[in-house]
């Protein structure tokens, strides 16, 4: 699953090539997929579908933040700590041979660069998936969702202003339509529907 047919952004020649050129040659490493995008666009929906493809666990910054901070203030220092912990956990899991999917905004290009460097060095394969969604759909979904995320529509608008453009190879999934349409895009990028064998 390390080579993708549908890639958006940048030069695709080396996209999703896995660890073929990595000097460690650790065939036991697990796959790493990163799902990024603005709050409310449907990252978790996409992450869950990818996890079914790679038979992996999902790590979410929303969960990690609340594990690390009893009363999160979303400061820059807190965000740095959350992403450092996210990447450390992903590194450990991939190195141990477990597939892992990261579900996080990754608005800051520095964090995306850090996780890409780690993934290309440690994981069996690395995929960056950017989730997009029409703004009107995001607003409706945020109004009715009830989950662990604290993000409301004002948070979405804030991140829309500060989200660093993705300049590296990645797959884009448009989650504006029905779930089946979103799943079809993920399946196309990951080689067909996921196995139901478990």
What kind of feature is each model-predicted range?
Residues 45-98:
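Conserved substrate/cofactor phosphate-moiety recognition/catalytic segment
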Residues 72-77, 144-150:
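Short glycine-enriched, charge-decorated loop/helix-capping segments at active-site entrances
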Residues 78-127:
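Glycine-rich phosphate-binding loop used to anchor ATP phosphates in small-molecule kinases
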Residues 122-142, 173:
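Conserved phosphate-donor/acceptor-positioning beta-strand/loop module used by diverse small-molecule
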Residues 1-33, 39-48, 68, 179-198:
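Haloarchaeal acidic low-complexity proteome signature biased toward cell-envelope/secretome components but also
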Residues 67, 135-142, 180-183:
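Switch/connector loops and helix/strand junctions flanking conserved nucleotide-binding motifs
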Residues 49-53, 114-122, 189:
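Alpha-helical structural signal in soluble globular domains
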Residues 147-187, 192-198:
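Small-molecule kinase domains that catalyze NTP-dependent phosphoryl transfer to phosphate-bearing small molecules
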């Amino acid at each position: 699953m390390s080579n993708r047919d549908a890639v958006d952004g940048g030069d695709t020649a080396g996209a999703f090539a896995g660890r073929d050129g990595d000097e460690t040659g650790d065939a036991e490493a697990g796959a790493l997929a990163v799902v990024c995008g603005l709050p409310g666009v449907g990252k978790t929906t996409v992450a869950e579908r990818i996890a079914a493809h790679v038979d992996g666990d999902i790590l979410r910054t929303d969960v990690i933040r609340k594990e690390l901070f009893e009363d999160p203030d979303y400061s820059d220092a807190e965000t740095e700590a959350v992403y450092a912990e996210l990447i450390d956990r992903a590194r450990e899991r991939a190195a141990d041979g477990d597939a892992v999917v990261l579900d996080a905004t990754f608005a800051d290009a520095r964090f995306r660069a850090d996780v890409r460097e780690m993934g290309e060095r440690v994981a069996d394969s690395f995929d960056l998936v950017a989730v997009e969604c029409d703004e009107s759909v995001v607003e409706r979904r945020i109004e009715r969702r009830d989950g662990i995320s604290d993000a409301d529509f004002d948070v979405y608008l804030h991140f829309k202003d500060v989200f660093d453009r993705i300049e590296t190879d990645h797959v884009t999934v448009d989650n504006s339509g029905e779930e089946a349409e979103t799943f079809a895009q993920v399946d196309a990028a990951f080689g067909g529907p996921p196995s139901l064998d478990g």
